[in-house]
């Protein structure tokens, strides 16, 4: 009676099977070398685990350290001012929150800004204060270093995303384009809400469900988008096409809204409402106020207006710089799955073009999207790749160093002089400062950290709709000499120090002589003076016998 064979793929019975088994049994008495093979499943799992460890401890950890080091260097090589908001809507507010003195601009009395972003730096200030380390230099540099670290994380996230979507070569060139972009270098360490919006946008894109992405997470990306909206409500413009695409492609639309978007939006908005309730003292939805003022009512025109095509003819080409031809080339080469990124760029430019007031920084968040196409272009260059890389690097290096170290540096350098007036002046108790420049030209108490009496020309907009409205700065520049004689009609009200641009000296020289002011310091500002802005900043000091009188008007 034949015993049944085990279930190993052979049929029971049959001569061939019996002979095969008999042959195997005979050979078992000799030395047989069996080849050991690991299962494909085991091999793939082990390979992925090793790759994951490499990404964490090998390539990516070194990449992160390199990027952090570069952005820290970036931070210290940007010593110029860009726009007033990098101080007046962040650091000045944070300083006022922690140290209870300073100045809040009209946007805060009108509740157009959220305290969420300044709270980040206020927390840093509070920790430094509790540790007794709140020196003026730390108050200036620690927030900027914090912003630099966040920008470094965003840079690495962009690299990781492109590595998932394409391959390491494409990711490398996108990363190169991102790091050598002069405008990114110029902005990414500044304490601007636009910078934070850009950082959050890049990290959110890492979790966004792009075709080919392995890091999709609706909760994470929607949380980051919601935070970007809380910090800068116009982030909704950039994210509208991306959110719409996700909604259209999601098969479980109701689940996406009820279990992802609504809970995330509710939690984030509630947190923002509570933060603003604490600091404003009343419930207010600043995001609605901001959009109503800047988008619906278009009050931003008070600070200047531009033609509708400005972003296409000037703004976008300038921030792209020498990346522009590579961006155009990459748009033709990139696969269809990147079409949504191009649509987002064009949509953002079109919507912002409808608003009269335009600035370069408003479209900064679309710049990383453009780097994807620039990197794709470099990947496919063969003959001209080395010259193209040299051209990109050197041209952007020049622009980055010039704008970061030279152009518009005087308004920061003069604050160092004011620090000396406060900390090194034996008569500091009687010192006072009057900044006679276009409003918000310089930082304020966040860069002095001393309750020194200071004043500047103010420029709040008229919200009542008056025609031919002139703010204090406008009235001053109509006739500076008459304004000074009228404002400081007696010696008791004169400040000890005047700060002004060089173009004003000749016009007010009679006042300076009659009031016994002497020029004591000169600071270079720009090679491109225009309008009310001069090439240099002058500091005048009034030196009289006896004690100074501090009855300066505020």
Swiss-Prot record:
Query: Which residue windows are transmembrane per the record?
Result: 63-83, 136-156, 192-212, 224-244, 255-275, 315-335, 340-360, 362-382, 387-407
Q: What is its EC number?
A: 2.4.1.-
- What membrane topology is annotated for this entry? Multi-pass membrane protein
The listed locations are: Endoplasmic reticulum membrane
Q: Which residues form a coiled coil?
A: none
Keyword list, A-Z: Endoplasmic reticulum, Epilepsy, Glycoprotein, Glycosyltransferase, GPI-anchor biosynthesis, Membrane, Transferase, Transmembrane, Transmembrane helix
Alphabetical GO CC annotations of the entry are: endoplasmic reticulum membrane; membrane
Pathway linked to the protein: Glycolipid biosynthesis; glycosylphosphatidylinositol-anchor biosynthesis
Q: Name one GO molecular function term.
A: alpha-1,2-mannosyltransferase activity
- Primary site of residence: endoplasmic reticulum
Tree of life domain: Eukaryota
Q: Which residues are glycosylated?
A: 26, 427
Q: What class of enzyme is it?
A: transferase
Q: Which disease is it linked to?
A: Developmental and epileptic encephalopathy 80: A form of epileptic encephalopathy, a heterogeneous group of severe early-onset epilepsies characterized by refractory seizures, neurodevelopmental impairment, and poor prognosis. Development is normal prior to seizure onset, after which cognitive and motor delays become apparent. DEE80 is an autosomal recessive form characterized by onset of refractory seizures in the first year of life, severe global developmental delay and/or intellectual disability.
According to UniProt, the name of this protein is GPI alpha-1,2-mannosyltransferase 3
What lineage is on file?
Eukaryota, Metazoa, Chordata, Craniata, Vertebrata
């Amino acid at each position: 009676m034949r015993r049944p064979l085990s279930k190993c793929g052979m049929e029971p019975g049959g001569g061939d099977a019996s002979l095969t088994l008999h042959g195997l049994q005979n050979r078992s008495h000799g030395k047989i070398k069996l080849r050991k093979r690991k299962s494909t499943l085991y091999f793939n799992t082990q390979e992925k685990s090793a790759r994951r460890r490499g990404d964490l401890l090998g390539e990516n950890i070194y990449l992160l350290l390199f990027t952090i080091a570069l952005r820290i260097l970036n931070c210290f090589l940007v010593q110029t001012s860009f726009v007033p908001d990098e101080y007046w809507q962040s650091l000045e507010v944070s300083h006022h929150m922690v140290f209870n003195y300073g100045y809040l601009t009209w946007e805060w009395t009108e509740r157009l800004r959220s305290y969420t972003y300044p709270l980040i730096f206020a927390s840093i200030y509070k920790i430094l204060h509790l540790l007794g380390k709140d020196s003026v230099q730390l108050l200036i540099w620690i927030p900027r270093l914090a912003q630099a670290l966040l920008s470094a994380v965003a840079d690495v996230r962009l690299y990781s995303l492109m590595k998932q979507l394409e391959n390491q070569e494409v990711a490398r060139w996108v990363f190169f384009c991102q790091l050598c972009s002069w405008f990114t270098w110029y902005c990414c360490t500044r304490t601007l809400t636009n910078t934070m919006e850009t950082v959050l946008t890049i990290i959110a894109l890492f979790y966004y469900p792009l075709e080919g992405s392995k890091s999709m997470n609706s909760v994470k990306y929607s949380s980051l988008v919601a935070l970007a909206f809380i910090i800068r409500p116009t982030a909704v413009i950039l994210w509208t096409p991306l959110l719409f695409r996700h909604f259209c492609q999601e098969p479980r639309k109701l689940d996406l809204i009820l279990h992802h978007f609504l809970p995330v939006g509710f939690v984030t908005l509630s947190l923002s409402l509570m933060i603003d309730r604490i600091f404003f003292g009343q419930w207010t939805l600043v995001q609605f106020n901001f959009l109503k003022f800047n988008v619906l009512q278009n009050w931003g025109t008070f600070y200047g207006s531009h033609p509708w095509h400005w972003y296409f003819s000037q703004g976008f080409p300038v921030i792209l710089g020498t990346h522009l031809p590579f961006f155009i080339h990459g748009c033709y080469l990139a696969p269809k799955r990147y079409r949504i990124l191009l649509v987002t760029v064009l949509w953002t430019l079109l919507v912002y073009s409808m608003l009269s007031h335009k600035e370069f920084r408003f479209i900064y968040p679309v710049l990383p999207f453009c780097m994807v196409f620039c990197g794709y272009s470099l990947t496919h260059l063969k003959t001209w790749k080395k010259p193209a890389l040299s051209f990109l690097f050197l041209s952007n290096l020049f622009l980055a160093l010039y704008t970061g170290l030279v152009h518009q540096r005087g308004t920061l350098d003069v604050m160092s002089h004011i620090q000396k007036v406060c900390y090194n002046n034996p008569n500091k108790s009687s010192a006072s400062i009057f900044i006679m420049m276009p409003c918000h030209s310089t930082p304020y108490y966040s860069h002095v950290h001393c309750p020194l009496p200071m004043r500047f020309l103010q420029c709040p907009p008229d919200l009542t709709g008056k025609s031919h409205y002139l703010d204090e700065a406008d009235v001053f520049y109509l006739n500076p000499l008459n304004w000074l004689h009228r404002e400081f009609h007696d010696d008791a009200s004169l400040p000890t120090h005047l700060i002004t641009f060089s173009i004003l000296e000749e016009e007010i020289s009679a006042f300076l002589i009659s009031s016994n002011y002497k020029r004591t310091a000169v600071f270079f500002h720009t090679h491109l003076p225009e309008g009310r802005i001069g090439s240099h900043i002058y500091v005048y000091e009034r030196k009289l016998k006896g004690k100074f009188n501090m009855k300066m008007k505020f």
